[in-house]
């Protein structure tokens, strides 16, 4: 196995037993692929596929005018270039988008000619607004904030059969129904009522008999019956009836007469019930007809009209019940043949026939009118209107679309073989659905399971954006149609016809405010990746929280390998928001697929197939952990398998597929929990969710016990810097890495240099800090996709959300009661859980009615001390340490002329002071905040003069850009001259640059020449001269290209910013706030074991072992048994072993042992105790030393989900580290030095600090705002509110009889307006008395009673 740059430096000991058949796929593929399909950027006109934007345009165009004399056709589209790159968009608060230009063709037909001759054609490109672009990490930048569009899991279009589970009717009878759901258009429902008639509803309106719909489709009663029933044929001869016999239909009936064979032998006696045995005998005897008495047909229903053979008079209508009167007429008229419907109570009910009987319509027109009345009640129906409405409902491509998915699901469900077809319904479709529904009612076939993942599909970003875009286009279409009639006469161009505003508005609305367009969760790399892989059942066209029942939220067998059964939020959204499983992907129809290995005759192959939930149903699927021999043959007698969505066991020969990996069941977050298989599901759910809330610590620390997925998450999340091409590190500093690309990876015409600017101390969406640190050194070789710099919460290319803490499970003085956590002061001293939070504070200078606001250091009534951190422009310096109330940006606002007091007039006359007509509206640091200014950005409107600060910021940015471009040029130039040197040395010169003819060129000669003179050399060989010319042209070209790039960036920086109307200037100040861990902060492990820090004890008081090593954290052992998350104990044991081995390696290095000894010990760790073998022999001695140095803090272990370390392996590891195999040790009390009475479990657990910090929650109100109606203080930190003294608290004071305190609480401290104002005044005067008055809430009560019409007044004495 090849190791990457970072893997070589620190190898994880992997305990997995199963080989990797397939790597975990790229985790953001679902987002990126979907949007790439939507845009089809870079495709030429012929390459466009019928998806995304192209499909939306094709579905709306061509637009034809009402008269039909003009048409607007769509030719193609192209996307422009974005005005700013992603970082600039975030900084400036704009949307990262590209302009969309559509080429349309206007065709005007000649009115006079009969065969629509073309009179004029105009083609033009029309601007259709901006389309947001997806960043390479699967996010969108909308108005400067990063957002994610969450995929939606919705009911697939198609046809579904269901029943009401006996809830509708009191008898508990199952009422079956069918529903045709299109991708867009009207829903069509068929349903049975308790009397077994079939009804139809369109768009959930009033129901009509289903036969009305069939008649509207043009079927006659006879055709309907013919489609749904078979017939019994009776021949009538001389008062006797003869039935053409189909033996199987007699089953269950009672014989009216003896049934005899040809020889007269009785097969069934009269009065006996006919059984399957009798039917066999009848068929054997070959009886073709059966004589029955006339009354045998009484009560049966006619299948065809019965006509008098002589006169043509209708004796009985079709679908009429035969009675004695009709029979008498038939016998009299000597009718020869009667056809009746074959129905019975077992498997062929008379449902459609009964429905026809209650149907009041008799022909197509009446049926159409009836449907029109139901859809448009109150409007007078006409024949044309009724026909148009009906045709538009299901048969018009503009109004109705099943989509490819819908057609495929529809055809499969009704048993057709082809999967493609029209997007609209046809007659046959509707009849087929009714037939299937009647079959299900008759007991043939089963209803669908709506929660089966074969009936729910995923709508990704691209598809939702396409739908929104189409909505915009349809709005445009209406306007264009009206203008097209003008275009015929007035010679307009396409540009004059199309108004792109509705399209732009629809797209903007979707990305800005759709329920599924969410503010990205950017706490840490895991939360980013999980957010992008989320699948929600909520949103437009989906479910709502209130209506979603238990079934929809539950785990379904088809979730296996597609949707994670663990990761879902706790609370009202449980089960509605899910996460994709690690290996899942969507197919072309949007159904989730999971990968499997193909198994043939018990031999497991390496062929991998992706199957959707429907496709896998018939397969027999073994688990990934099924036992195989060396030849990959399944060897167990019985294998645990999944078949037909059930878990069962089968023989190896029956197995057809096998899981690719044990972790394919769970999502990315759940697959990061070691020993997940030992945790209770509820706690695992909490563990998955809490990892997403971990705040990136100051120094990331890799987990000692991981699962091996950490590297994938860090790489795919996009927070690390990954090498685009392999090469050598040319230079590296804290803020950028320059790579000289290897020659074999440079394509012609490209620069052989990659420059990576690192993100330094940037604010994330959640105010945490994004900072990248380089891992490479100058001169290192890197390969493509190696990790060169760590981001937040990553350590050497691995996800590192928390810190490894030495913990002990023991009760300790009640400090860890109820999940509290007791910490050692050492944790704070070493800054283990110190986090940096970055706050953005904005100051906006507007143009007001009274004049413009001004940003300045000249602020009225403010002392010098308050201004000493501001520069002359009135903006705080970068690096200043500021606290609550300090001025960050000085700003003054003009205030209206006020009446001056005589004193002020006098002062003005003496000092000529004008400062009083402006008021101080400076940006100050909010309460409870203390930090360092790390950055300032100034945005100025076009036409407003820029201040000195803005100019200095611009100069710094230009210097950075110039430095980058110069560096790039230096490397390109250096590489070119190196290539020339190797080509020229040893060849003869013809002259030039002061050389003699025939002189050999050496390195010394070239070193003596300036670079510019190399090109003056004339060589003896023409090929070399040509190479020199090409090199010179290339270098000049490159220089010009880089200069153009610089000018372009300069132009962008110097142009004014596009600010909101009325805004002159915006100053953004970024504060970095350092937060150490403190009591009240929430911490957690990865197993759902969460708690709040209760106390931070001095190191010397903490329990310590015999060597004097104190523990860092004391946890309560009672938190484990009832919660059943035993994974944390195993993690603690393995963590202890990992740390012990690291210490052992450290001792070997300090004792300067031989490399061979180190190599032997590493071999013991990696290759002798279970799990995967590592190829340490391929490492050089230096690499072994580097590896050992990085292992001194502990040997990282990986115990993959469901394939992790066994108990015996943990014990072997502890033994190798010279630690007790029990994982327990004797501890001593730090305060007394006494032994604790029994050994304690001590080890290393990975702990996270969650983004629920006490600093963000704690606040105290002094004076603040009041609620308008009740005049009581507001609640909550955001409103600077007070603590509610509620009903129960009042009871408590009443119980103590604390009358004065109670009065104070309910009046002056709450809503007695006059009382509290007076009291404030008294306190200022030093008089500490209060006079309670009438609380405002009492007045509110009086007003409410009056609103009920009761006059109530307070009597004053």
UniProtKB/Swiss-Prot annotation:
E.C. code? 2.7.7.6
**Any GO BP annotation:** DNA-templated transcription
Q: Which CDD domains does the UniProt entry name for this protein?
A: RNA_pol_B_RPB2 (cd00653)
Q: Does the keyword Transcription apply?
A: yes
Q: Which reaction does it catalyse?
A: RNA(n) + a ribonucleoside 5'-triphosphate = RNA(n+1) + diphosphate
> Could you confirm whether the keyword Zinc-finger appears in this record?
no
Query: Which InterPro entries would you find in this protein's record?
Result: DNA-dir_RNA_pol_bsu_ext_1_sf (IPR042107), DNA-dir_RNA_pol_bsu_external_1 (IPR019462), DNA-dir_RNA_pol_su2 (IPR015712), DNA-dir_RNAP_su2_dom (IPR007120), DNA-dir_RNAP_su2_hyb_sf (IPR037033), RNA_pol_bsu_bac (IPR010243), RNA_pol_bsu_CS (IPR007121), RNA_pol_bsu_protrusion (IPR007644)
**Which one Pfam family would you cite for this protein?**
RNA_pol_Rpb2_45
Q: Which UniProt keywords are given for this protein, alphabetically ordered? A: DNA-directed RNA polymerase, Nucleotidyltransferase, Transcription, Transferase
Origin: domain of life: Bacteria
* GO cellular component terms, A-Z: DNA-directed RNA polymerase complex
Q: Tell me which SUPFAM superfamilies the record gives.
A: beta and beta-prime subunits of DNA dependent RNA-polymerase
Give any GO molecular function from the UniProt entry. ribonucleoside binding
Protein function: DNA-dependent RNA polymerase catalyzes the transcription of DNA into RNA using the four ribonucleoside triphosphates as substrates.
Q: Which family does it belong to?
A: Belongs to the RNA polymerase beta chain family.
Q: Describe the protein's quaternary organization and the partners it interacts with.
A: The RNAP catalytic core consists of 2 alpha, 1 beta, 1 beta' and 1 omega subunit. When a sigma factor is associated with the core the holoenzyme is formed, which can initiate transcription.
PANTHER family given in the database record? DNA-DIRECTED RNA POLYMERASE I SUBUNIT 2
NCBIfam families, A to Z: PRK00405.1 (NF001616), rpoB (TIGR02013)
What protein name does the entry list?
A: DNA-directed RNA polymerase subunit beta
Its source organism is Pseudomonas fluorescens (strain SBW25)
Q: Which lineage? A: Bacteria, Pseudomonadati, Pseudomonadota, Gammaproteobacteria, Pseudomonadales
Identify the coding gene. rpoB
């Amino acid at each position: 196995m090849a190791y990457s740059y970072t893997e070589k430096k620190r190898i994880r000991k992997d305990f997995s037993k199963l080989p990797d058949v397939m790597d975990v796929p790229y985790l953001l593929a679902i987002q990126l692929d979907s949007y790439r399909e939507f845009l089809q950027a870079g495709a030429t006109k012929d390459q466009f596929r019928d998806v995304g934007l192209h499909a939306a345009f094709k579905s709306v165009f061509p637009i034809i005018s009402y008269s039909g004399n003009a048409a607007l056709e769509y030719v193609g589209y192209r996307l422009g270039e974005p005005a700013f790159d992603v970082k600039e968009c975030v900084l400036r608060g704009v949307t990262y988008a590209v302009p969309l230009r559509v080429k349309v063709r206007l065709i005007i037909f000649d009115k006079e000619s009969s065969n629509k001759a073309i009179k004029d054609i105009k083609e033009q490109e029309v601007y259709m607004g901006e389309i947001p672009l997806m960043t390479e990490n699967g996010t969108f930048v909308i108005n400067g904030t990063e957002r994610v569009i969450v995929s939606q899991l919705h009911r697939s279009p198609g046809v579904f059969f269901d029943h009401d589970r006996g809830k509708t009717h009191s008898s508990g009878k199952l009422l079956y129904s069918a529903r045709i759901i299109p991708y867009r258009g009207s829903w069509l429902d068929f349903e049975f009522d308790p009397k077994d008639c079939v009804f139809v509803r369109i768009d959930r309106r009033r129901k009509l008999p289903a036969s009305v719909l069939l008649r509207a489709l043009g079927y006659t009663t006879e055709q309907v019956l013919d489609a749904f029933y078979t017939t019994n044929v009776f021949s009538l001869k001389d008062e006797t009836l003869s039935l053409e016999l189909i033996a199987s239909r007699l089953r269950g009936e009672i014989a009216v007469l003896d049934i005899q064979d040809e020889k007269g032998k009785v097969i069934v006696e009269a009065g006996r019930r006919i059984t399957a045995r009798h039917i066999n005998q009848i068929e054997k005897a070959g009886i073709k007809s059966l004589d029955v008495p006339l009354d045998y047909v009484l009560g049966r229903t006619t299948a065809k009209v019965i006509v008098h053979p002589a006169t043509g008079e209708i004796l009985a209508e079709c679908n009429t019940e035969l009675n004695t009167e009709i029979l008498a007429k038939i016998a009299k008229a000597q009718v020869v043949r009667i056809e009746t419907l074959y129905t019975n109570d077992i498997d062929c009910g008379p449902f459609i026939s009964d429905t026809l009987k209650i149907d009041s319509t008799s022909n197509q027109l009446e049926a159409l009118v009836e449907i029109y009345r139901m859809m448009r009640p109150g409007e007078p129906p006409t024949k044309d209107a009724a026909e148009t409405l009906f045709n538009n409902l299901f048969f018009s491509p503009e109004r109705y679309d099943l989509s490819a998915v819908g057609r495929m699901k529809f055809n499969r469900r009704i048993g057709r073989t082809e999967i493609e077809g029209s997007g609209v319904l046809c007659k046959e479709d509707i009849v087929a659905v009714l037939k299937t529904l009647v079959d299900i009612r008759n007991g043939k076939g089963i209803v669908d399971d709506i929660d089966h993942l074969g009936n729910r599909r995923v709508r990704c970003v691209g598809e939702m954006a396409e739908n929104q875009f189409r909505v915009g286009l349809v709005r445009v279409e209406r306007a264009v149609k009206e203008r097209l009639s003008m275009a015929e006469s007035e010679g307009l161009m396409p540009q004059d016809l199309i108004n792109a505003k509705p399209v732009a508005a629809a797209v903007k609305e979707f990305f800005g405010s759709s329920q599924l367009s969410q503010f990205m969760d950017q706490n840490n790399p895991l939360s980013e990746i999980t957010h992008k892989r989320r699948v929600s059942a909520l949103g437009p066209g989906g479910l709502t929280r209130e209506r979603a029942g238990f079934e929809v939220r539950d785990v379904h067998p088809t979730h296996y390998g597609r949707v994670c059964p663990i990761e879902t939020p706790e609370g009202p959204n449980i089960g509605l928001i899910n996460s994709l499983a690690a290996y899942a992907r969507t197919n072309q129809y949007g159904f989730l697929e999971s990968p499997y290995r193909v198994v043939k005759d018990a031999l497991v192959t390496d062929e991998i197939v992706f199957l959707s939930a429907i496709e896998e149903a018939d397969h027999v699927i073994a688990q990934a952990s099924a036992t195989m021999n060396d030849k990959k043959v399944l060897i167990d007698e019985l294998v645990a398998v999944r078949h037909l969505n059930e878990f069962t066991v089968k023989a190896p020969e029956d197995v057809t597929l096998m899981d690719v990996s044990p972790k394919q069941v769970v999502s990315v977050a759940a697959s990061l929990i070691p020993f997940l298989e030992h945790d209770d599901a509820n706690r695992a759910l909490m563990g998955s969710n809490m990892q997403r809330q971990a705040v990136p610590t100051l120094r990331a620390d890799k987990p000692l016990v991981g699962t091996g997925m950490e590297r994938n998450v860090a790489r795919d999340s996009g927070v690390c810097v990954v090498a685009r091409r392999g090469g050598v590190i040319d230079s590296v500093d804290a803020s950028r890495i320059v790579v000289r690309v290897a020659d074999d990876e440079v394509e012609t015409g490209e620069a052989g240099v990659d420059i990576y600017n690192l993100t330094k101390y940037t604010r994330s969406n959640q105010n945490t800090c994004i900072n990248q640190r380089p891992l490479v050194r100058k001169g290192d070789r890197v390969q493509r996709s190696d990790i060169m710099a760590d981001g937040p919460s990553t350590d050497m290319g691995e996800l590192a959300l928390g810190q490894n803490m030495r913990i002990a499970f023991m009760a300790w003085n009640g400090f860890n009661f109820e999940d509290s956590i007791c910490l050692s002061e050492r944790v704070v001293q070493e800054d283990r859980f110190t986090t940096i939070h970055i706050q953005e504070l904005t100051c906006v200078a507007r143009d007001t009615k009274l004049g413009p606001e001004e940003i300045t250091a000249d602020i009225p009534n403010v002392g010098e001390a308050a201004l000493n951190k501001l520069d002359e422009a009135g903006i705080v310096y970068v690096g200043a340490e500021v606290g609550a109330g300090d001025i960050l940006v000085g700003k003054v606002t003009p205030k209206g002329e006020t009446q001056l007091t005589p004193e002020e007039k006098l002062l003005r006359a003496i000092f000529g002071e004008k400062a009083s007509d402006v008021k101080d509206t400076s940006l100050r640091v909010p309460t409870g905040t203390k930090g360092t200014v790390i950055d300032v950005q100034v945005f100025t409107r076009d036409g407003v003069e820029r201040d000195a600060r803005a100019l200095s910021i611009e100069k710094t940015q230009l210097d950075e850009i110039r430095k980058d471009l110069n560096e790039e040029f230096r490397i390109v130039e250096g590489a070119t001259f190196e290539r020339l040197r190797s080509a020229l040395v040893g060849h003869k010169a013809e002259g030039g640059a002061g050389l003699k003819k025939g002189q050999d060129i050496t390195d010394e000669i070239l070193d003596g020449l300036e670079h510019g003179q190399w090109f003056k050399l004339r060589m003896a060989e023409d090929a070399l001269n040509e190479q020199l010319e090409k090199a010179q042209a290339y270098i000049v070209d490159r220089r010009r290209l880089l200069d153009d790039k610089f000018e372009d960036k300069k132009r962008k920086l110097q142009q004014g910013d596009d600010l909101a109307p009325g805004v002159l200037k915006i100053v953004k100040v970024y504060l970095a706030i350092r937060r150490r861990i403190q009591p009240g902060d929430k911490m957690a492990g990865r197993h759902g074991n969460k708690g709040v820090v209760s106390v931070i004890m001095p190191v010397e008081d903490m329990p310590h072992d015999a060597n004097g090593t104190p523990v860092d954290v004391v946890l309560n052992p009672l938190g484990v048994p009832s919660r059943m998350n035993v994974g944390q104990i195993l993690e603690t044991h393995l963590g202890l072993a990992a740390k012990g081995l690291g210490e052992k390696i450290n001792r070997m290095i300090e004792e300067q042992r031989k490399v061979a000894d180190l190599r032997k010990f590493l071999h013991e760790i990696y290759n002798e105790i279970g799990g995967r073998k590592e190829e340490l022999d391929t490492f050089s001695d230096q690499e072994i030393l580097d590896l050992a140095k990085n292992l001194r803090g502990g040997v990282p272990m990986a115990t993959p989900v469901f394939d992790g370390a066994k108990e015996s392996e943990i014990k072997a590891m502890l033994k190798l580290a010279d630690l007790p195999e029990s994982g327990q040790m004797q501890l001593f009390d730090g305060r007394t030095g006494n032994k604790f009475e029994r050994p304690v479990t001590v080890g290393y657990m990975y702990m996270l600090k969650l983004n629920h910090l006490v600093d963000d929650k704690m606040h105290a109100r002094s004076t603040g705002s009041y609620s308008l109606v009740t005049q009581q203080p507001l609640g909550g930190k955001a409103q600077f509110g007070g603590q509610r003294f509620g009903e129960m608290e009042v009871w408590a004071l009443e119980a103590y009889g604390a009358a004065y305190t109670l009065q104070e609480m309910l009046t002056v401290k709450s809503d007695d307006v006059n009382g509290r104002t007076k009291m404030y005044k008294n306190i200022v005067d030093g008089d500490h008395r209060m006079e309670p008055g009438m609380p405002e809430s009492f007045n509110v009560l009086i007003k409410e009673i009056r609103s009920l019409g009761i006059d109530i007044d307070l009597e004053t004495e």
